[in-house]
Amino acid sequence: MAVQQNKKSPSKRGMHRSHDFLTTAPIAVEPTTGEVHLRHHVSPNGYYRGRKVVKTKND
């Protein structure tokens, strides 16, 4: 079995674990339609920052 040679300090242990927890994705609400979407992405109905930028099937 593998055995550590030297004890890992609390600082190094913290740095090792620093990226382990997950953060929630930043969510934005489209002001014109109220749709929820990822920030800096076009909403499902084709709006970005209050303007229609993509034609959808319903248009």
UniProtKB/Swiss-Prot annotation:
Single GO cellular component term: large ribosomal subunit
Basic residues: bias regions: 49-59
Question: What are this entry's molecular-function GO terms?
Answer: structural constituent of ribosome
Q: Which GO biological process annotations does it have?
A: translation
**One Pfam family hit:** Ribosomal_L32p
Question: Any idea which UniProt keywords this protein has?
Answer: Ribonucleoprotein, Ribosomal protein
Does the UniProt entry include the keyword Ribosomal protein? yes
Q: Where is this region: Disordered?
A: 1-59
Xref: HAMAP family = Ribosomal_bL32
The family annotation for this protein states: Belongs to the bacterial ribosomal protein bL32 family.
Protein name as catalogued: Large ribosomal subunit protein bL32
Organism this protein belongs to: Ralstonia pickettii (strain 12J)
